[in-house]
Structures are given as structure tokens and as C-alpha cells.
């Protein structure tokens, strides 16, 4: 039986929380930032939580977390 492997892309994107959820970063903050307002970029710095419906998929990709 082969070992269960962690999806490395998901491991870099999601961090588990104590209550069983996963933290995630906001998108749209890598490039083409000159046309985006300071307020918009500031709000994109904050972290978010993944949706409840995606929790099972992320948990399957991160079996050892």
C-alpha cells in the first residue's frame, strides 16, 4: 500500500485553524496593482476562511494536517 501524499499546492495555500477550518489568502494581489485603489489593496491583505462546502475537499488534499 503506498503512502498517502499531501497535495503540496494546497499545503502552501491553506493553513488549518484550531476549530477545524482553514485560513486562506485573498487573490488579486500579485500584479497589475497600479490601477487598484489603496483601500482595495489594503482589504486584500486580510486573510479569509474557506467556505464550508470546500472543507471536505481541502481536508482530503491535506491528510496529515
Swiss-Prot record:
Annotated coiled-coil segments of the chain: none
Keyword Protein biosynthesis: no
GO molecular function: structural constituent of ribosome
Keywords: Ribonucleoprotein, Ribosomal protein
Stretch list, region Disordered: 1-46
Domain of life: Bacteria
Keyword Membrane annotated: no
Basic residues: compositionally biased ranges: 25-45
BP-aspect Gene Ontology terms: translation
GO CC field: cytosolic large ribosomal subunit
InterPro entries documented for this protein: Ribosomal_bL35, Ribosomal_bL35-like, Ribosomal_bL35_CS, Ribosomal_bL35_sf
Short name of one Pfam family: Ribosomal_L35p
HAMAP family: Ribosomal_bL35
Family statement drawn from the similarity comment of this UniProt entry: Belongs to the bacterial ribosomal protein bL35 family.
Protein name per its UniProtKB record: Large ribosomal subunit protein bL35
Gene: rpmI
